[in-house]
Amino acid sequence: MNCGIPYCGFGKNIEGMTVGCPLHNLCPEFNDALCKNQPELTLKRLLKTNPFPEFTSRVCPALCEKACVEGLNFKPVTTKDNEYEIIEYAFEQGLIKAKKDIGKNGKKVVVVGSGPAGLA
């Protein structure tokens, strides 16, 4: 990939707007591994910063694509679509298995919000 200095995983708030991925996904790393046809490494890089890519890839506003330096001269890298395909492939190939319910432990929790932070 010809990113130069990538801003897609930057996740920086500048004047009230987020530039790049607010989850700080390692977009250049997993996109590069995807280009090199390394599915295990691609998945590993994606899961390093994002515990729920199966959800976030569907609701993502693709701020990484808006910050993509490739988009200055060409179309930006389709990181949102790539993230979706990576996780779908991982489930299809058995690289990820659904986690089993650990059962009740007697503790109570409150979840505030329905976004990625609430899920974590």
Regions found by a protein language model. Name each.
Residues 1-108:
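Ferredoxin-type iron-sulfur electron-transfer modules and their immediate structural context
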